[in-house]
Curated annotation (Swiss-Prot):
This is Ornithine carbamoyltransferase, catabolic. Pfam families: OTCace (PF00185), OTCace_N (PF02729). It comes from Salmonella typhimurium (strain LT2 / SGSC1412 / ATCC 700720). PANTHER family: ORNITHINE CARBAMOYLTRANSFERASE, ORNITHINE CARBAMOYLTRANSFERASE, MITOCHONDRIAL. The gene is arcB. Belongs to the aspartate/ornithine carbamoyltransferase superfamily. OTCase family.
Length: 334
């Protein structure tokens, strides 16, 4: 079956079929191999790409820029203080302006409705670099990384547990990705931090077709047993006030990924994943504040696990670039 994603937006995985998602992962694997071998073919020569960042970023910005440059495209970075978007000009108007000047647009910001509006009116492919609800490019990288570290297996044969704040964009997106690809996902969190019930129902409906297994539980021991991968994210998301830390730390500490949790999987080959940045020690400004306030040297993951042989977080981070490149090539490439 020939799959063409030409001129498609990439706003959320719910918009894509399992075959289309697998196509993007396969393309990313091919592009990664070509780059390593020094034989990458450029398909974006002469293309101009706008990168809209209403939230700051390291990995997403670098991934989009390097991917674009590798493929021969030019980029314009519009940072949080470098444009009139939402202040003097609506997103609808911005979309129609940028769509006349650029061949593709990336957006990283707040509400999902904003990137959806951008995608509706731009007239060129729009890619979601992160919103409060979804982070689809991260999930492509995660699925690619899982396949790399489970040779000979397909995604429906893999299981993973996500611990922590499961109602954030990562919890949402991992659940959607697992549902679409027929995987076994366990979301382990306090019940008040489970994903929105409507999204859970939507994912369960998808799972009834794909064969995915979706488990929501408060029990760490039950949830992690037998999984291939452990996954976590920060406990306080971008944009949330510092005042939220105390309550969040109290609620989330039982869900920290530590050696005890690794042992509870019963899988000596279990791998650890994190979308980064991670609070795993006191070597950052925030890390020092956390240690002073709560006496903790790590939050969602301990230094021991983060730096262990089973940690594949930097493979995962690298794959952000390869999967983002795949999205741009598939939707915009010649």
């Amino acid at each position: 079956m020939v799959i063409s994603l030409k001129n498609r937006n990439f706003l959320k995985l719910l918009d894509y079929t399992p075959a289309e998602i697998q196509h993007l992962i396969d393309l990313a694997i091919e592009l990664k191999a070509a780059k390593k071998a020094g034989c990458e073919k450029q398909t974006l020569i002469g293309k101009n790409i706008a990168l809209i960042f209403e939230k700051t970023s390291t990995r997403t910005r670098c991934a989009f820029e390097v991917a674009a440059f590798d493929q021969g495209a030019q980029v314009t970075y519009l940072g949080p203080s470098g444009s009139q978007i939402g202040h003097k000009e609506s997103m609808k108007d911005t979309a129609r302006v940028l769509g006349r000047m650029y061949d593709g647009i990336e957006y990283r910001g707040f509400g999902q409705h904003i990137v959806e509006e951008l995608g509706e009116y731009a007239g060129v492919p729009v890619w979601n670099g992160l919103t409060d609800e979804f982070h689809p490019t991260q999930i492509l990288a995660d699925l690619m990384t899982m396949l790399e570290h489970a040779p000979g297996k397909t995604l429906p044969e893999l299981s993973f547990a996500y611990l922590g704040d499961a109602r954030n964009n990562m919890g949402n997106s991992l659940m959607v990705g697992a549902a679409k690809m027929g995987m076994d996902i366990r979301l382990i969190a306090p019940k008040s931090f489970w994903p929105d019930a409507a999204l859970v129902a939507q994912c369960r409906e998808i799972a009834s077709v794909t064969g995915a297994r979706i488990t929501l539980t408060e029990s760490v021991e039950d949830g992690v047993h037998g999984v291939d991968f452990l996954y976590t994210d920060v406990w306080v998301s971008m944009g949330e006030p510092k005042e939220a830390w105390a309550e969040r730390v109290s609620l989330m500490t039982p869900y920290q990924v530590n050696q005890q949790v690794v042992n509870a999987t019963g899988n000596p080959d279990v791998k650890f994943m994190h979308c980064l940045p991670a609070f795993h020690n006191e070597h950052t400004k925030v890390g020092r504040e956390i240690e002073m306030a709560y006496g903790l040297k790590g939050l969602e993951v301990t230094e021991e696990v983060f730096e262990s042989a089973g940690s594949i977080v930097f493979d995962e981070a690298e794959n952000r670039m390869h999967t983002i490149k795949a999205v741009m090539v598939a939707t915009l490439g010649d």
